[in-house]
């Protein structure tokens, strides 16, 4: 399983997780020249930007640790661009992280959804 397949598996799991909890998926892999946001979703009056991090081991720490200040700043700038372009009408904006650990065979061993992560 390559990194792209691992990432897709994590995003698929996250979208299923969000749908089951009443989120509406607005965008998946929203790309602009500055970068990409994995998932943009809505729940009530919230617009939520979600970064999904999936790993097969903890050699480099827990997946959420990969969303460092630089990555957070980039996601916030992409969010500003999304809002200025799409002009969605939301009262609140939130940034969440889905952290997923897989077995070597690709099964989900553990996950954590971090609300308001940054």
UniProtKB/Swiss-Prot annotation:
Tell me the protein's name: UPF0102 protein DICTH_1420
Say which family it is in: Belongs to the UPF0102 family.
Which NCBIfam families does this UniProt record tie to the protein?
PRK12497.1-3 (NF009150), PRK12497.3-3 (NF009154), YraN family protein (TIGR00252)
Q: Which PANTHER family match?
A: UPF0102 PROTEIN YRAN
Task: List the InterPro entries.
Answer: Restrct_endonuc-II-like, tRNA_endonuc-like_dom_sf, UPF0102_YraN-like
What is any Pfam family matched here? Answer: UPF0102
**Signal peptide: which range, if any?**
none
Q: Which GO terms describe its molecular function?
A: nucleic acid binding
Species of origin = Dictyoglomus thermophilum (strain ATCC 35947 / DSM 3960 / H-6-12)
């Amino acid at each position: 399983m390559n990194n792209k397949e691992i990432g897709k598996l994590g995003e698929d799991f996250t979208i299923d997780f969000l749908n089951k909890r009443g989120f509406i998926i607005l965008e998946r892999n929203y790309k602009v020249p500055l970068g990409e946001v994995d998932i943009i979703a809505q729940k009530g009056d919230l617009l939520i930007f979600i970064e999904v991090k999936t790993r097969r081991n903890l050699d480099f720490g827990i997946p959420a640790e990969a969303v460092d200040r630089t990555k957070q700043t980039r996601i916030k700038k992409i969010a500003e661009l999304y809002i200025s372009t799409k002009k969605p009408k939301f009262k609140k904006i939130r940034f969440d992280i889905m952290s997923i650990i897989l077995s070597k065979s690709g099964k989900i061993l553990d996950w954590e959804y971090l609300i308001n992560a940054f």
